[in-house]
């Protein structure tokens, strides 16, 4: 499956930038989730790659093919990009059966493909099965009801699965009535003669039949622009129905299926044309919580079995964390971080990423700090309490601040240079500093809070709830402000001075509101952010 490369991709409407100068490489066979808040540009990115939305500028490459380039004037239509799209609503035809819904798109495909002699191919396959009929006989005998009568529908499904044949070939095989023990030598001879006649016919016309019954000339397949045959369509439908496990529903209508079953049909329909890339736009949003969890496992399995490249849009960070091989986190059309899920969780690039990923949300504490000679950072937190932060890797704050200021100046220089370009359109939806939330007992309206003058001493501590441990040996005193036990864990709100911390406590311990406790921060995953 192909790699996808996006270069300087931008989409704007007037001064509103939905996607702002995005550079992204999606590896072959990756499962990438586009994650971010509503309106951040996730679906727009997906639609641009698929060809459903025309970018304002930039370049898109799928595999070794440029499908969009604003400078070269290239824009390959969506139906020529070999991609599949799965939407939030299943978009199934209510007047068609499951089989017809999956086959409908296949019946509309018309493109250049090898010429195949399916009559000869099916005759050869039938002769092969008839020469060793024991397996087919065993299958047929397994399909008898308690009265010994053969269940035709069940037998056809089993024959299709066992021999990977179409329903048309399976019916021919069924009609031989192998379970009756009849001599098949005459039928085998007739089938062999049919294959030989086809070989001779092609040979007389200057062609040959390959082992897969493709018509060849000079050792190369003969190509022709054609539609798929009913045999090819049926084989594709049977293949994908087996993958998503809906073979028993093929004769039902969408109204007769549950939400999860309808979603499986939509997935099968998308997979049937064998797209190079599969795009999914919040496909699980309409399902209940239990079914959504089950479908996540199904999508994981589907990704492995198909070997396809998956690009998945969601605002649910739990879906992103559990499904993705890489998370692409977007905010206001700008890429925030593109890493494997655990790196995004444990090593967020900025405060926005730390706040968005994680449930319950990360705890933020404002602090004043200065670096000591040994490299540690002495902090003042809460209402004047002292703490020491020891970086996991050696860090010189003065050097880091100098590099930060230099990068900010460089960005400003580049921006001023862009303003001189007459074709440049200034961004109306400005990129503003993320306003993180500090949980306090007396909540104030953060919109009314004045922005203070910040110095290099101003920092923000980030602590994940699972790294706050309630322990009698803890050095911080607190009070239980609220508790939500869920069985294997409890989410506890703890009051320390006027601040509220969220902790996750594993086990079945019960907490009472107002209870005095002690706590401490554990592990090496406490984060320190530059407040400026």
Predicted feature locations:
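The feature captures the beta-strand-to-loop junction immediately N-terminal to the Walker
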Residues: 35-37
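Short coil-to-helix segment of the ABC ATPase nucleotide-binding domain corresponding to the Q-loop/switch region
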Residues: 96-105, 114-119
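ABC ATPase nucleotide-binding domains
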Residues: 100-104, 108, 212, 223-352
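Non-catalytic connector elements of ABC transporters
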Residues: 161, 171, 373-532
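ABC ATPase NBD coupling module
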Residues: 67-84, 108-115, 127, 139-153, ...
């Amino acid at each position: 499956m192909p790699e996808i490369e996006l270069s300087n991709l931008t989409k704007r409407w007037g001064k509103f930038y939905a996607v702002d100068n995005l550079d992204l490489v999606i590896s072959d066979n990756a499962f990438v989730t586009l994650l971010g808040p509503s309106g951040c540009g996730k679906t727009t990115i997906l639609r641009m790659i698929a060809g459903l939305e025309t970018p304002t500028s930039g370049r898109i490459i799928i595999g070794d093919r440029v499908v969009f380039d604003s400078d070269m004037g290239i824009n390959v239509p969506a139906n020529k990009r070999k991609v599949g799209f799965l939407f939030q609503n299943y978009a199934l035809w209510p007047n068609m059966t499951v089989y017809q819904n999956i086959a409908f798109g296949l019946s509309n495909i018309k493109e250049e493909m090898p010429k195949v002699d399916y009559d000869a191919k099916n005759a050869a396959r039938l002769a092969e099965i008839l020469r060793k009929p024991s397996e087919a006989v065993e299958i047929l005998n397994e399909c008898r009801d308690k009265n010994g009568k053969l269940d035709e529908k069940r037998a056809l499904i089993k024959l299709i699965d066992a021999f990977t044949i179409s329903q048309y070939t399976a019916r021919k095989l069924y009609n031989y009535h192998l379970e009756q023990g009849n001599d098949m030598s005459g039928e085998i001879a007739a089938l062999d003669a049919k294959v030989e006649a086809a070989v001779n016919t092609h040979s007389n016309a200057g062609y040959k039949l390959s082992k897969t019954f493709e018509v060849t000339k000079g050792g190369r397949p003969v190509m022709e622009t054609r539609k798929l045959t009913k045999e090819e369509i049926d084989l594709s439908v049977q293949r994908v129905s087996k993958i998503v496990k809906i073979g028993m529903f093929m004769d039902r209508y969408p109204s007769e299926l549950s939400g999860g079953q309808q979603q499986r049909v939509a997935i099968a329909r998308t997979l049937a044309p064998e797209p190079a890339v599969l795009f999914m736009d919040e496909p699980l949003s309409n399902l209940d919580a239990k079914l959504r969890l089950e479908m996540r496992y199904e999508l994981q399995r589907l990704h492995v079995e198909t070997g396809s490249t998956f690009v998945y849009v969601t605002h649910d960070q739990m879906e992103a964390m559990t499904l993705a091989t890489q998370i692409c986190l977007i905010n206001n059309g700008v890429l925030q971080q593109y890493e494997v899920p655990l790196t995004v969780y444990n090593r967020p690039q900025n405060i926005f990423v730390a706040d968005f990923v994680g449930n319950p949300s990360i705890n933020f504490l404002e602090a004043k700090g200065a670096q000591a000679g040994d490299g540690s950072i002495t902090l003042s937190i809460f209402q004047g309490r002292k703490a020491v932060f020891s970086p996991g890797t050696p860090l010189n704050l003065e050097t880091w601040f100098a590099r930060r200021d230099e990068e900010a100046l460089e960005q400003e220089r580049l921006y001023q240079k862009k303003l001189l370009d007459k074709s440049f359109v200034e961004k109306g939806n400005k990129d503003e500093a993320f306003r993180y939330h500090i949980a306090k007992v007396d909540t104030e309206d953060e919109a009314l809070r004045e922005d203070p003058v910040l110095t290099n001493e101003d920092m923000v501590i980030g602590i994940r709830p699972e790294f706050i441990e309630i322990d009698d040996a803890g050095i911080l005193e607190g009070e239980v402000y609220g508790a939500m036990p869920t069985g294997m864990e409890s989410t506890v709100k703890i009051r320390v001075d006027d601040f509220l911390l969220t902790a996750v406590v594993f086990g079945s311990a019960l907490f009472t509101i107002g209870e005095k406790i002690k706590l401490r921060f554990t592990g090496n995953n406490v984060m320190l952010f530059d407040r400026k």
